[in-house]
Amino acid sequence: MGGWGVVSLEEAPDDLRNQAKRNYEHIKNEVITEEKQSILSKYQVNDFDSVLLIATAPRGGSSLLFDILRHHEETCSLDGEHDRWLTLNGICYPAFESDVIPADFESFDREKLLTDLLAEVGVAERSGGRTHRVDNTLVRLPLQFPNRELPYKRIREKLLEGVSLDEILKEFGIPPLQYDEYSEQDANSPFETETIEDRPFVSSHSHKRSLTVDDFKRTLVLKASGDAYRLPWIREQLFPETDVKVVHLTRNPAASINGLYDGWRLNRGFQTYNVGDLDLEGYSGSLWCYDLPPGWVSEGKLIDVCLMQWVQAHRHILDGRVAFDDVLRVRFEDVLTDTSSTIKEIIEFADLGESALLTENVKNPNKVMTTKDPRHARWRDREDLVKSALNRADKTYTEVVEKLEYTEESEWI
């Protein structure tokens, strides 16, 4: 479901980005429904009355939590993470040395970014809407295949006729394996690297419809693990006047870094940046995966990089949360073991009220963004490797573990 985000080329990202922008603007202004065109011409993402932001480290369980919450009938949401829209606007590496965006960074087209962030937002409603899903498929295609000139109007007609996207992609020589909702088997080789957004996992669930003017009274649910490094910037530059509540989702270090280790070693869309040559023990790929923390390294052990990603993300959330008045810390372990009560706590925190559609989803949540079948304490399959990294960890790791209250290994499910 929530497409990881970006793969940006170090060599010529501007050419690729400009091509994606051109095709996206064409779709936004000429291909999607007139109703959606009207919304995007008059409104921006900061026009919502309230925002619920999920902040966590990668492989922290945010995709599952996001998918549950976006089924609440008083919410709106994107179809996945919003990193791709920041990348389209050049607000990413290599413009920055890492995923950290300074709170005072203002050198970007704010109006355009806020409009772009609204481009695929839909409303949770049981009946859903086919045109919404078709429009969202179209606005994402230039980000996913920016170096291809596709007949977007014809693609839209075929989608509305009921032709599957798989069939349409095959017609243009694009393996469906490279797109959303593909088979669980891993690709034999990495996907095309010239993308703004990686294809897998992004989808609009069937209970979403297009935005109307009245929907801005609802709560917008957002999540992207990269937000861990830009919370003050989000508060000051994107939503300075919006009621923003933050859910800090935590997960024990062993399970998180084990999930990261799995994801790095799969050709399944977790690649994010071309940072140059990588010499990481345990990794044979050529692209960086997941978030790019400050102090990232290109040499060493992959398991240590995974630990760094967990530590740095949560350290920055702990530091950046002071920019917000309302922050709720939630354990992913509780989302798994006491789903109903934990979701109820979040719903009350966000002032959302009851939702029959949400209740149904809580009882039978979707399986999203998994690298392997979910299983408690799966990290113990490579316990020696994981603990070797934890034993080498520095003082910052110890401080984060203590602040997040993960000092008892018996609780690391």
Locations of regions flagged by a protein language model:
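PAPS-dependent sulfotransferase catalytic core
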Residues: G2-F201, P365-K372, I413
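PAPS-dependent sulfotransferases, especially Golgi type II membrane carbohydrate sulfotransferases
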Residues: G2-L52, R265, F270, L278-R329, ...
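Small/flexible residues
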Residues: G61, S77, N89, D135, ...
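A short, structured active-site edge motif that brings together acidic residues
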Residues: E81-W85, L249-N252, L358-V362
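PAPS-dependent sulfotransferase catalytic domain
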Residues: K153-L357
